[in-house]
From Swiss-Prot:
Its EC number is 2.7.1.48. One of its GO terms (biological process) is CTP salvage. ATP binds at G12, G13, S14, G15, S16, G17, K18, T19. Keywords: ATP-binding, Cytoplasm, Kinase, Nucleotide-binding, Transferase. This is Uridine kinase. SMART domains: AAA (SM00382). Belongs to the uridine kinase family. The gene is udk. Its main location: cytoplasm. GO terms for cellular component: cytoplasm. CDD domains: UMPK (cd02023). It is found in: Cytoplasm. Pathway: Pyrimidine metabolism; CTP biosynthesis via salvage pathway; CTP from cytidine: step 1/3; Pyrimidine metabolism; UMP biosynthesis via salvage pathway; UMP from uridine: step 1/1. Disulfide bonds: none annotated.
Length: 210
């Protein structure tokens, strides 16, 4: 068994740019010779195959209860023990978990991201770095609108209704308060190259300390 992997947690509101930051860190650390993977909390939305579509479409994806957090924590702990996992895949158009899974191998660096990543103390306790990506509400909404239409088969009206009904209020109730747990706050998400440079250098320094 090798050294303990470095675990970096990145959170922020939907459309904040946290996944852009996460993927850029994976790319840079991989280019530098470290193995790095991205594990997304979104993959662990609960299976809803036992519910009719009329109920699935009402799911509040921005509430802590929408995630199978026990499985997420279990898989993260397994990766920390240098064990491979079978990561769930979420089928957004059908609002449930896909039948397929994705094999994920352990790595030197595990980057985890998600809107409610810091909400559970079991997850926070496993993170060596905790990063909050802080982006203006209007920018986050416009990014989410574009993403959900292009990638998830949503309608403009559906995205707007969901944002006003759950996304915005849940952000202020559950996401923004977890900013206090962050070691580092990154404004402007993936466009903040200075911050990404700093995060990359900090991760490299922590790897050397291992």
């Amino acid at each position: 068994m090798g050294l303990k992997p470095l675990v970096i947690g990145i959170t922020g509101g939907s459309g904040s740019g946290k996944t852009t930051v996460s993927r850029e860190l994976v790319r840079r650390l991989t280019e530098d010779g470290s193995s790095a993977i991205l594990l997304q909390q979104d993959s662990y939305y609960k299976d809803q195959s036992d519910k009719p579509m009329s109920e699935r479409v009402k799911t509040n994806y921005d509430h802590p209860d929408s995630f199978e957090t026990d499985l997420f924590v279990s898989d993260l702990r397994r990766l920390l023990r240098h064990e491979a996992i079978s990561k769930p895949i979420y089928d957004y158009p059908n609002h449930t978990r896909a039948k397929e899974v994705e094999p994920v191998e352990p790595a030197d660096v595990i980057i985890v991201d998600g809107v409610l990543l810091f909400n559970d103390s079991r997850v926070r306790d496993l993170l060596d770095m905790k990063i909050f990506v802080d982006t203006d509400d209007d920018i986050r909404f416009l990014r989410r609108l574009e993403r959900d239409i292009d990638e998830r088969g949503r309608t403009v009206r559906g995205v707007i209704d969901q944002y006003l009904a759950t996304v915005k209020p849940m952000y202020h109730q559950f996401v923004e308060p977890t900013k206090r747990y962050a070691n580092i706050i990154v404004p402007e998400g993936g466009e903040n190259l200075v911050a990404i440079d700093m995060l990359t250098n900090q991760a490299k320094a922590m790897l050397k300390q291992n």
